Structure formats: structure tokens, C-alpha cells
């Protein structure tokens, strides 16, 4: 008994150390980087109080973001230091996710609890979400808390746990609609048997849980339904394809285990788990809980003609089960091949490889910006002249610039851009601004900007790498600035969304820019 107590005490101390290290890794530089585009949406959505949120959603019931996270972050309004204040909530819940995954993993097997916590603590992907003014770290915490009480109910059959499961799952719904597949399909766990002595769950428990979830979510569902009057759900400017099922699945694996050798090892472990495990039904259920939400989202995208990319962040609630399943598979592998345990511990080796793979990219992540709109706006305000044209591509970049220019939003949480039909298949979007008495124009168009060059205007271009290369084929532009965004958690982690600032100045055609090639 004394030995067990010492083991528990040592594991508890290791967990405390793990949480402290995790906090330090998430706190470091968390408020130093410029907002990227999605964070700018968040801070704009967080300015309204509860009354303001209700009014906005009444007018915009199909808005794709649920309101709870905005209401929580509003408590830090008026955001005296926005880059810090908006990221405090994700930082807190990102850190709390470490002990939460430990508690959840312990429900499946005590031997995988600490490995799961260690893997998450050093995971650069999760560190980035904990420093991101979005709801993903909160979502993961709420999902793990709901799963924890779900398994506790399966173990004990106590009805009180169902209320807690319903509360956490309902908070998931109010935080992000992307959690709906997880809420629905994680209930495959009703067939999971956590121990030999666990009673078989009753159908009444299933009805109680789902009745409570429906009861808690119904007010918002009715509110949205009552105020829906045929508004469009998807922004018509979003034309991205979600991709094939294989593309989405690879994206999830790529982001969660980063490097190809680890991706291959993880896939093999997931495949071998039902074969090696003594409890095959449980193994298949865990795998289904991870894979089915991805399948569900893919089917939804195909049936609804969903025009948006699908990222691993949409499946953040499944990530804890993913790591738990990997370590359970490693447990089964070690039991099956006990002879090899004398030479090396496969679970220990896998943890080392996971941590090492993340430590390789972590310094690069810390040095890089998310999407440096702040630096871009500061540069432009120092060099802009009266009559200048600022051409932005893609159009969404306008929002980032206007935020850091200090331009206010309309009541519809959008910027009032002028729209002008310049040809049968092209519209120009523009806004005129004043800075220190200088009037200039920020605009987006596909090709109409060529006219400004032909008219002899001084034209700036704020573009991504691909567009910068294309424009340079036709005009000898000067590269005036590079604004880093090389390690952003966007479609993939990392995604390079760096911006290039080019200048066409007819009065200084030979002007030199920064010594950097666009490659």
C-alpha cells in the first residue's frame, strides 16, 4: 500500500510539473503577436454585451459562429490591450486541458493518463490554439469534461453525471456549431464497457441525457428558427472546396502528429488496436468515436454543397480520444510482445518522438507571426501619400488592415465598402480613408487595378506569395515589405499566409526595395 501511495504521489508531482511547463509554454509570447484575420473577427464579435448579441443574432440567425465564446470574452471588454485580453480565455482553458486530459485518460487506463498529458503539454498545435483568440481550446476542454462525466456514468450508473454531461455538451453547442457531430456521434460510447463490474447502461439513461441536451439547446434552436427568413448560410465569397475524405483525414493526422514517420506509426497503431486489444468491442468503439465525426462532416459537406475548407480544428473534441487510443494501442502492443520490454519501452519511445517532433517546430512558431496586419498597417501609415491606391488581394485582407487602421464597424459587424460594377464579371470593393490629411483608397478587384497603373497612380499591393509572383511577371514592382505569417494554424498546421507589400511608383521606377526574393 505504501508503494502504491509513493507511485501516486510521484505521478501527482509529475502532473503538477507538466501543468506548470504547459502553462509556461503557452504563456510565452502569447500577447506579442499581431491578430490574424479570424482573431479580428472574434474581437469584433466580442464587443457586444448579451443584449447586443441577441440583437445581432436576431438580424443574423444564420451567422456561423455560436455566441457563448463572444459573451465570455466580452467580460474583458473594452480590451485595453487587445492582443493580450482576447487570448486570456484560450490561454486559461488551454492550460486546464492538461489536467483534464489526464483525468479523462485515467478513466480508460491509469497507465495512459500521464503520457496523454505529456503529449498535449508539449504539442505545438495545441500551444498555438491556446495562444489564439478563438474558441478551440475552450471547446477541447468542454468536450473532455463532457466525456469524463460520460465515462463516470458508464462506470457507476449514477444519474447525476448525466446532468453534467448534458451541461458540458450543451455549452459545446453554444460555443461552436462545429461540435454538433461530436455531440451526436460520441454517444457511440454508450456501447463502451469501462470495466467488468460496470452495469449495462439503460435506454432510459440515453433518453435522459439526450432529453437534457435538447432541453438546454432548444431555446437557441427556437430563437434561430423564429428569426430565420431565408438568409444565406454561407458567404458567397467563400468558394473553397472541403476536399475528399482522404484529404480531410490526412489533414487531421498531419496536424496532430506533424511528421510523416509519426503519421504512419499512428495509423498503424490505430489499425492494430482492435487486433491486439483484449477488449475488441471497446477498441472498435473508440476508433469509431474518432473517425465517425470526420465521416459525418464529410457527408454533410457533400450533401449540402458546403463551400469552405475543413480543418482539423473542427474535430478538436476528438483529439483527446485520439491520443488516448494511441497509448492504449501501445499498451496492448507491449502486453502482446512482452519480450521486447526488456530492451525498450515502446510507449516511452513514442512519447519521446512526439515531444521531439514538436520541439523542432516550437522555436520557429515562437519567432513567427500569425499574420502581421499590425506591422503592415504601421508601415503603410508611415509611408502613405495623398492619392495613393492600396490594392488588397484576397479581399478578406481589407478587414485586417481596416482594424489596425482604427476604422469602426457598422451595426452589422462589417465594414461599409463601396461596390462598383466595373465589368460584366468583376466588382471593385473600395473604401476611402484619411491619415494625417492624406486621402488614399483601399480596394480589391481582380484586374481593374491595372487601370490605376495606366493612369499613372502610385499603387501599393498587399498580396500573398502566389499573387505577388503573378503580378511581378507583368510589372517591375518594388518589394517594400514582407510581413510574416509562416506558422499559422489555418487549413493545415503550419500554413504560410505571409503578406508581401509591393509598390508601383511612376516617379521612381528604379527604386530599390528590400533585398529579398519572392520564392
Go through each PLM region and give its residues:
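N-terminal hydrophobic targeting signals that begin at the initiator methionine
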Residues: 1-4, 107
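N-terminal membrane topogenic signal
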Residues: 4-15
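Membrane-proximal helix-loop-helix interfaces that form the catalytic/acceptor-binding platform
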Residues: 18-338, 350-518
